[in-house]
Regions:
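Nucleotide/phosphate-binding site architecture used for ATP/NTP-dependent chemistry
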Residues: 205, 209
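Conserved small/polar residues in nucleotide/adenosyl-binding loops
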Residues: 236-241
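Short Pro-Gly-centered flexible turn/kink motifs
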Residues: 216-233
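Short coil/turn motifs at secondary-structure junctions
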Residues: 102, 233-234
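Polysaccharide-binding surfaces and accessory modules of carbohydrate-active proteins
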Residues: 1-197, 202, 212-214
Length: 241
């Protein structure tokens, strides 16, 4: 098992031999959609910065710490900032992404997913909340399979049909026992939540803006801030209080 197609990747992009679902896809003036994300630097600060123009969690300097990972694509001139804020008292990490065009030409952002998480196995159940008008938030739980399983909305709002939340948990997990990962998008527009199991039995979870009909034009010097995802991981054992 070698190569991009089975490696755990923190922020997967298109056109780099990872054929699973990407977190970001662009289109330049020549029709090129490939994008390589290289690490450049990082910064750790107390507290949590505000997200421009978006609702988000908030914290004082003593309630959270934020890690910013600075990446870049040498071909397009895009700078990508991955932001992680840790809330120790709540076992919560929030994630968001900002993309800035530092190149010489305009570029279109065709896909920007706030969170991508690669897990080393596939024996999970997926839990989602579905419904309809006046009958929202019904729990659905099923074992994930090879391929893609997703929830989404493309109506411009999160909608009553699917909630912008999902969880992955052990097959035997309950409210009191087992391992579970939860993900919620702090955004009321169109969204996509997807879980993909690749050929090597590894799981990729993604949550963010729905790429359906999405395109954001970035002139040189402009940036785009993606909404925030709240993540939590719970591990309950028989000895847990």
């Amino acid at each position: 098992e070698t190569g991009f197609d089975c490696a755990p990747i923190e922020f997967p992009t298109s056109g780099v031999a990872d054929f699973r679902e990407p977190a970001m896809q662009v289109m330049d003036i020549n029709g090129m959609s490939a994008c390589e994300c290289y690490y450049k630097d990082y910064r750790i600060s107390n507290g949590k910065p505000k997200l421009k123009g978006l609702p988000a969690t908030y914290a004082t300097d003593d309630e959270a710490q934020t890690l910013e990972v600075f990446c870049y694509d040498p071909h397009s001139g895009l700078y990508i900032t991955l932001m992680y804020s840790v809330f120790p008292k709540f076992d919560v990490i929030t994630r968001s992404v900002k993309v800035e065009n530092n190149g010489l030409a305009a570029i279109d952002l065709r896909r920007i997913i706030s969170m991508s998480l690669d897990l080393d196995r596939m024996d999970y159940d997926m839990i989602t909340l579905h419904g309809t008008w006046a009958r929202e938030r019904h729990v659905q739980r099923f074992p994930i399979r090879f391929g893609k399983q997703s929830i989404d909305s493309n109506r411009g709002a999160t909608s009553h049909a699917h909630n912008n939340f999902f969880a992955l948990c052990d097959h035997t997990a309950t409210e009191d026992f087992g391992e579970a990962y939860g993900f919620a998008l702090v955004y009321s527009g169109s969204f996509l939540g997807m879980v993909e199991v690749g050929q090597y039995e590894k799981t990729r979870a993604l949550l963010g803006i729905n790429p359906y009909d999405f395109s954001w034009h970035l002139e040189p010097g402009e940036d785009f801030q993606a909404p925030e995802v709240i993540m939590t991981c719970l591990l309950y054992t028989s000895d847990a209080a």
